[in-house]
Swiss-Prot record:
Core subunit of the mitochondrial membrane respiratory chain NADH dehydrogenase (Complex I) that is believed to belong to the minimal assembly required for catalysis. Complex I functions in the transfer of electrons from NADH to the respiratory chain. The immediate electron acceptor for the enzyme is believed to be ubiquinone. Keywords: Electron transport, Membrane, Mitochondrion, Mitochondrion inner membrane, NAD, Respiratory chain, Translocase, Transmembrane, Transmembrane helix, Transport, Ubiquinone. The lineage of its organism: Eukaryota, Metazoa, Ecdysozoa, Arthropoda, Chelicerata. This is NADH-ubiquinone oxidoreductase chain 2. The gene is ND2. The keyword Electron transport applies. It catalyses: a ubiquinone + NADH + 5 H(+)(in) = a ubiquinol + NAD(+) + 4 H(+)(out). The chain crosses the membrane at residues 3-23, 47-67, 81-101, 105-125, 128-148, 153-173, 177-197, 220-240, 253-275, 293-313. One of its GO terms (biological process) is mitochondrial electron transport, NADH to ubiquinone. One of its GO terms (cellular component) is mitochondrial inner membrane. Pfam families: Proton_antipo_M. It is found in: Mitochondrion inner membrane.
Length: 313
């Protein structure tokens, strides 16, 4: 029921240009997500309260700033609108609340938080973009990559990975590139595969992989998904990054280099996750024809690659 309300709120936002409608849909979105977080554990109640307080504060800031901007058209209020949305997205330096609630989130609620819940704030950023925020987006992407290296909980690593990818998406939005929609969709498909596998394997910490017996098919799918998220060729994540670089070529060269460096750092902590997988059931070859034939993620990668080539070439 709640997921349908969230979907409707997103569809209404897609068809609106009014800041008031955006604000109203964000509130509906927030109130619909809170019951999804609830699994009747004390940790979850604390997380729900934290989420509610942060989202209420950012929504209030957005409402007041938008109202004042519509009256006085001052740059200060325009910047505050952007800041309020960045708080909702959990971009650095406003990411602390995401880390606080991450441990108590279920994999299902984490998936929604990292994908669907970002759509309305990103639509608002597209309407109220301040180009002065671009350096913040880029530094947020870099810092998220660096900070992820000290964490060992998979949910926290995925959150920092999401923040890093958000930096790319926000830069695409800042440059008025509609490719950000495709980037978000491809990222959502990849992260869906990873989170579903983590849930099936009950994978919460990096050390868990060395203690669990994992089926070859599941291991293979996880490796493919992580390599795609890392942007390794020939997976769809690589072409996603290449297309983003192509569209951002006109941006400041230093900024572009920082984004690429952040992706290379991301590759390091993705490899931290992948390394144990390569040594589980080592007799299994991930490139064997039978396993490739049955592997869902390979089919998805091939399909998305064909679609991407047809769209852009």
């Amino acid at each position: 029921m709640m997921i349908w309300i969230i979907t409707i709120s997103i569809l209404v936002s897609l068809s609106s240009n009014s800041w008031f409608i955006f604000w109203l849909m964000m509130e509906i979105n927030m109130m619909s997500f809170i019951p999804i977080m609830n699994d009747f554990k004390m940790k979850n109640y604390n997380s729900m309260i934290t989420y509610f307080i942060i989202q209420s504060f950012s929504s209030s800031l957005f409402f007041i700033s938008s109202f004042q901007y519509s009256l006085f058209n001052m740059e200060l209020f325009f910047s505050l609108i952007n800041i309020s949305v960045l708080i909702k997205l959990g971009m650095i330096p406003f990411h602390f609340w995401l880390i606080m609630i991450s441990e108590s989130l279920t994999f299902y609620s984490l998936l929604i938080l990292l994908t669907i819940q970002k759509i309305i704030p990103l639509l608002i950023i597209e309407k109220f973009m301040n180009s002065l925020m671009i350096p913040l987006f880029i530094m947020s992407s870099l810092l998220a990559s660096i900070m992820a290296m000290k964490y060992k909980l998979i949910k926290q690593i995925l959150i920092f990975s999401s923040i890093s990818h958000q930096g790319w998406i926000l830069c695409l939005i800042a440059k008025k590139m509609n490719f950000w929609v495709s980037y978000l969709m491809l990222y959502s498909i990849i992260i869906y595969s990873i989170i579903i596998n983590c849930k099936e394997m009950n994978f919460n910490k990096l050390c868990d992989l060395t203690k669990k017996k994992i089926s070859s098919k599941m291991k293979n799918t996880m490796i493919m998904s992580m390599m795609s998220l890392a942007g390794m060729p020939p997976f769809i994540g690589f072409f996603m990054k290449i297309m983003a670089i192509f569209f951002l070529m006109k941006m400041n060269l230093i900024f572009m280099m920082i984004l690429i460096i952040s992706s290379l750092i991301n590759l390091f902590f993705y490899l931290r996750i992948l390394t144990p997988l390569f040594f589980i059931n080592s007799k299994f070859s991930i490139w064997s024809f039978n396993n490739m034939k049955s592997n869902f993620m390979i089919k998805i990668n091939m399909l998305l690659l064909i679609i991407l080539i047809n769209i852009f070439f």
